[in-house]
Amino acid sequence: MAVALLSIGTELTRGEIINTNEAWLAAELTAAGFTVSESSTVDDDVDRIVAAVRQLASAHRLVIATGGLGPTTDDLTAKAAARAMGTDLVRDESTLLAIRRRVESRGKTMNAGHEKQAEVPAGSEILPNSSGSAPGFGIHLGESTVFFLPGVPREMKSMFAEQVLPRVRPAAPNNTFQVRLRTYGLPESTLGELLKGVEEAHPGITLGYRVHYPEVDLKVHARAATQSMAHDLALKATADVRERLGTAVYGEGGDAFPEMVGRSVRARGWRLAVSESCTGGLISHLLTSYPASDYLVGAAVTYANSAKTRLLGVAEDTLRGHGAVSAEVAAEMAQGVRRLCEVDVAISVTGIAGPTGGTATKPVGLCYWAVSHPGGLVVRDRVFSGDREEVQLGAAYAVLDLLRRIAGNLPER
């Protein structure tokens, strides 16, 4: 079944925020077997919302709209949906009660904005919101079903999974299956070269790539006569892909790179310490963004040379002789924080994140990182391209990947 997506919000049409909802919904629907054939974005204007809803509903059996269900005056989606149906807004008392309980449980007082969120088109199906106050709702326009969800990503995702997907899944084709592989370390062009011939070797397989620096996601999408056959085809093709890409594949589905690194460290029974300079605490943040990160004992952001010397014991002679951005300093940072925290393994990074500070011999983007572990000390370097944030993220991933490979006894690329 072909599906259309409608994103509602002036902040989207003005480019003030990135439309992550559309990308997420498209990926989830594709994985469920649907085909997203059209997507539109419209500002907070009732007439334009009505026109967009009617146009998409006339051409698709299923439409999913996001945004404009909040408490403010520019949240006009419910009003537009009612007009598209040719009906009025009504206050749903059960929804109002749920909103009141949620608001008062947080020690707040109901206001007109909260009450506005309980107004839905007459005859619509209410979709409860377990993550927020604004409910969603579904309507029928001709032969089309249109679901309206809040634009807040966290609320939209939970409502799609809890309310929408169970309702529409029976209409999805049951002859597809998809595997999502997570990769790091190889650019999209290299992945494409390594995977040449996979689709020809496995008829019914389509490969899709999505770059989100510094990772690349690979979708192995299978279509066959039955879902069981598609499942088997996808697994067979995935095995082929994994063999070609080797350790560049770090996980599947919802696996996250920092989390997988942490699992490798925990599997060795190691305790970890981190020392950072140019990344400013980013590595520690990435590692502790996931549960079960108690393998991390401590971290030090030693941005100034004086902090490197005072906290980590980096020798002043090393700093004078080689500079703060050097293999020697990266090594002493890792060894120093390992001693300081009395741990099994320690990592460090130092570099020039830019946009200023580079020289002819040490350009912007140059980073050194080190891992001090029970088997020895390893130091690596690279010049990363991009803006300051990309250099920092690239360096953080590079040292985590080195740690992953050492902990997992994996070869370096």
UniProtKB/Swiss-Prot annotation:
Q: What is the lineage of its organism?
A: Bacteria, Pseudomonadati, Myxococcota, Polyangia, Polyangiales
What start-end ranges are recorded for coiled-coil regions in this protein? Answer: none
Family recorded in the similarity comment: Belongs to the CinA family.
Concerning PANTHER family, the annotation shows: NICOTINAMIDE-NUCLEOTIDE AMIDOHYDROLASE PNCC, NMN AMIDOHYDROLASE-LIKE PROTEIN YFAY
Q: Where is this region: Disordered?
A: 107-129
What is the protein name for this chain?
Answer: CinA-like protein
Alphabetical list of Pfam families matching this protein: CinA, CinA_KH, MoCF_biosynth
Composition-biased stretches, type Basic and acidic residues, lie in 107-118
